[in-house]
Each structure stands twice: as structure tokens, then as C-alpha cells.
UniProtKB/Swiss-Prot annotation:
UniProt keyword annotation of Plastid present: no
Main location class: secreted
Gene3D superfamilies assigned to the protein according to its UniProt record, in alphabetical order: Phosphatidylinositol (PI) phosphodiesterase
Cofactors that this protein relies on: Mg(2+)
Cystine connections: C45-C51, C47-C190
Protein name, entry field: Dermonecrotic toxin LruSicTox-alphaIC1c
């Protein structure tokens, strides 16, 4: 999965997919009542990027729906996964459940079109704070009560705070999550970071007894870091330059080992070589 980083305006969806991304990451900010408000990152952000692209959240969802609905004039067949980077740092811990509820209602109406030929992409809810695990329950309970529990098959999870893996597992246990788990590791492209924790996450993924199904590393903009990540065995790479990742994947060392994921590749299945 080549994951376009910080795709916060509708125009950027086309831009990143056309550069080679089959997945995008979108920032979601919340208002004081825990309603998802904007797709917006703000300053500071990654070096070399404009931090100020934004849409109203529901407008972005409608644009995303068009980009992931077969038959639509804006449809991109290869856009198959969306990571919502949920900026819950502005919320109190006791608002996490409400945030999940409101997020689910917005997605149900504006992305899934109330279950009537909505967008088809898989969705990862990425939460920065382990204490906000109740967001997951709020989201799931809402889809169930609205009669759309089937859509949970399209939803996965990530805790993005670079916490110790056992602590992440414990948060999932409290949230009642047993699958559909992506594990991120990384830091802004302005700073270096080793692959030490990525390797721990990959070991958990491959152990057969861990909770992690997929591992992605962010933010990777250089060919050398891309190669290091692929050598470590990641499933996804988040990048500001999808074309760089696509280039490296076509190199002789990688083109027979890796391929770009398609809609038929279940993002919740742990890959076994």
C-alpha cells in the first residue's frame, strides 16, 4: 500500500492517486462537541508541504465517495484504502465515545450513502491516544444501532502514538478489538527515526499470536528509507511522494517480492509468503 500523506482537500485526492498512491491519509479535526469538523492538519507539518489545505469534513467525504464509487466520473479504481488520522488531542478523554458516534454517523451518511452504493474503500480509524479507545466502541455501536453492522467489515484500526506494542495490545483488549489492526510507526519527514519499533511490530504481526495484521511506516520520502522499509517487511509506506515509492517497487530487488495492492487484497489479512 502506497499511502499518500496529508491528503486534506478534494483536489489532492486526484493529485496523489495520479502519482501512484493506492491509499491516502486524511487528517480529521474535531470541534468542542466532538463533531468531526475539518480535514485539516495545520502548522507545523512535514517539511516541504503546504500544511493549510482543508475541506469541511462532510464535503471531503462526498468527494472521497465519488473517487471510490465505481461508475462515478471521478472514480479511481486503484484508491482502495483511506486512513483517517483522527486529531483527538483537542478532546477530553470522556468525549472519545461521542467522537466515535459522530464520526460513524457522518461516514454513514456522506461516505457510505446510508448503505446505498456508497464508496467502496476500506477505512482505517487512526487514533493518536491509547486512552481514547472508546472511540472505537462509539463507532461500532452506532453502525450497529443504525442497522449497518455489515459496514464494519470495511473498517480497521490503528493507534498512531508510537506506544509500546504491549500497551497497544492492551488498549485493543479494552476496546474489544480482535482483528482489522494496522500498526503505524514513524515521525515527520523533518526528523530521522530508526526502524527498531517497526521491526517489533512486524515481529508481532508474524508471530501468529499478536494482534497486528499490517504494519506501515511514515513519513518516507527518500529512496534509501523506502528500501530499508521494504527490507524490514512493511505492508505500507506513507509518503509525500508516491512516485518515489512506486519507482523503488519497480527496482529489480523488489519487483518480484512486492506488488501494489488492489481491491481484491483484503487489508485485514496478515500476509503469509
Amino acid at each position: 500500500w502506497i499511502m499518500g500523506h496529508m491528503v486534506n482537500s478534494i483536489a489532492q485526492i486526484d493529485e496523489f492517486v495520479n502519482l501512484g498512491a493506492n491509499s491516502i491519509e486524511t487528517d480529521v479535526s474535531f470541534d468542542k462537541q466532538a463533531n468531526p469538523e475539518y480535514t485539516y492538519h495545520g502548522t507545523p507539518c512535514d517539511c516541504g508541504r503546504d500544511c493549510l489545505h482543508w475541506e469541511n469534513f462532510n464535503d471531503f467525504l462526498k468527494g472521497l465517495r465519488k473517487a471510490t464509487t465505481p461508475g462515478d466520473s471521478k472514480y479511481h479504481e486503484k484508491l482502495i484504502l483511506v486512513v483517517f488520522d483522527l486529531k483527538t488531542g483537542s478532546l477530553y478523554d470522556n468525549q472519545a465515545y461521542d467522537a466515535g458516534t459522530k464520526l460513524a454517523k457522518n461516514l454513514l451518511e456522506h461516505y457510505w450513502n446510508n448503505g446505498n452504493n456508497g464508496g467502496r474503500a476500506y477505512i482505517v480509524l487512526s487514533i493518536p491516544n491509547l486512552n481514547h479507545y472508546k472511540l472505537i466502541a462509539g463507532f461500532k455501536d452506532t453502525l450497529k444501532s443504525e442497522g449497518h453492522e455489515d459496514l464494519l467489515e470495511k473498517v480497521g484500526h490503528d493507534f498512531s502514538g508510537n506506544d509500546d506494542i504491549p500497551d497497544v495490545e492492551n488498549a485493543y483488549k479494552k476496546a474489544g478489538v480482535t482483528g482489522h489492526v494496522w500498526q503505524s510507526d514513524g515521525i515527520t519527514n523533518c526528523l530521522p527515526r530508526t526502524l527498531k519499533r517497526v521491526r517489533l511490530a512486524i515481529a508481532n504481526r508474524d508471530s501468529g499470536s499478536g494482534i497486528i495484521n499490517k504494519v506501515y511506516y511514515w513519513t518516507v520520502d527518500k529512496r534509501s528509507t523506502t528500501r530499508d522499509s521494504l527490507d524490514a517487511g512493511v505492508d505500507g509506506i506513507m509518503t509525500n511522494y508516491p512516485d518515489v515509492i512506486a519507482d523503488v517497487l519497480s527496482e529489480s530487488a523488489y519487483k518480484n517480492k512486492y506488488r501494489i495492492a488492489t481491491y481484491e487484497d483484503n487489508p485485514w489479512d496478515t500476509f503469509k509468503a
